[in-house]
């Protein structure tokens, strides 16, 4: 189980007033890159999520067996910039870039004809990989001046996840006297809010406001049973699901 909680707030401002006031420029950039790997492994070395058994692993239990990997990520980012002057041009700009790269894998290792993983669990085997993301990004830029003014805000969110529940090749689960349920589940649930706003104010000149909010959500969510596996079970369930709720808004004026 891995929990990531991130709060990042950056605000900049520049103000010039008086008869000799000149131009003001305020810029507020934020860049955040999060990478995480959460593995639950049976039959392979730690951190070798793609590994093949180097020896036969036998698990013999009286009740149930579970291989579970969970990664929960909560991110809030806010960037704001304000440039105000009474005698010249005001410029305010904000840029927020957030990149989230995750691997969440629950794996019963890949086997061969010689080496494999054997699990005896009368009450069943579950292999579960679960990833959740709750991301909120807010970006705002304000430029105000007696003459021309300009403002801009850009928010870019990139989420790329690899979520895998895997019962490897040549795995052996149960026997004629032990038939529990076998459940493989992979899920990725994301809630994302991405808002960018920009405003340009001018008394006697031109003003420009530009905002942009981009979201790139990619990756794979997969549950699989490998080739040449032998399973004795009452029921076998293999499920994968990606559930994404997004709100992306860009406003400028």
Spans of model-derived segments:
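Low-complexity, glycine- and small/polar-enriched segments
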Residues: 1-253
